[in-house]
């Protein structure tokens, strides 16, 4: 799992409280991963691709393949070979122009409360850092745990995830490690899933 932090982030020597937020289904309505693929390739290519991926999606739905494998199949189909710089730019644009339309007002108010209290904020998700990190920076988060796209020597997307996927236990392990480094006196957690 990739972890991104703001440049000015320090260890939590003052033992400031930490608020940990899940993303998909908690801060935003629904999923961010598949809409990002549609955002990158456009509607027609996206729907054709989803038809092609249907057997894999069915295998995932029935538990035949795991979350990482289906995610890499989708990434490979839609993003493999694309310049990493282009995908980073699209991730920033997606964070600024699309994700805010899916934000849940109650959760955004909760984030604002923690920001006003000067709490440290961590965004923890199995979604892609390429758009989570810019969204988190806009919304005053101090750190982000998410899935990092693998990039080859020519700065192109390989279609794989670099490191852990950040789903289920991997997400919990990343958050636990992040919290252990800061030793907060209090932790708030917001989520809707594993």
Q: Model segments located where?
A:
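Metal-dependent phosphoesterase signature
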Residues: 70-106
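C-terminal cap/substrate-recognition subdomain and adjoining C-terminal extension
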Residues: 11-12, 16, 89, 96-194
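Conserved alpha/beta cores of soluble small-molecule-handling proteins
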Residues: 43-46, 63-66, 83-86, 105-106, ...
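Active-site neighborhood of HAD-like aspartate-dependent phosphohydrolases
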Residues: 6-66
């Amino acid at each position: 799992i990739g972890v991104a932090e703001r440049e000015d982030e320090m260890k939590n020597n003052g033992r400031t409280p930490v608020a940990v937020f899940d993303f998909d289904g908690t801060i935003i309505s629904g999923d961010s991963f598949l809409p990002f693929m549609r955002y990158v390739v456009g509607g027609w290519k996206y729907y054709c691709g989803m038809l092609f991926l249907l057997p894999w999606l069915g295998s995932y739905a029935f538990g035949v393949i795991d979350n990482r494998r289906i995610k890499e199949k989708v990434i490979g189909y839609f993003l493999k070979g694309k310049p990493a710089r282009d995908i980073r730019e699209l991730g920033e644009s997606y964070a600024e122009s699309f994700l805010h339309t899916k934000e849940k007002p109650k959760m955004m108010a909760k984030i604002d409360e923690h920001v006003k209290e000067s709490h440290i904020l961590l965004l923890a998700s199995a979604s892609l850092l390429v758009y989570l990190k810019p969204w988190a920076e806009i919304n005053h988060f101090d750190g982000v745990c998410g899935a990092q796209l693998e990039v080859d020597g020519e700065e192109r997307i390989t279609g794989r995830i670099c490191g852990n996927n950040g789903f289920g236990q991997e997400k919990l392990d990343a958050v636990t490690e992040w919290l252990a480094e800061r030793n907060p006196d209090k932790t708030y957690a917001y989520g809707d899933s594993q």
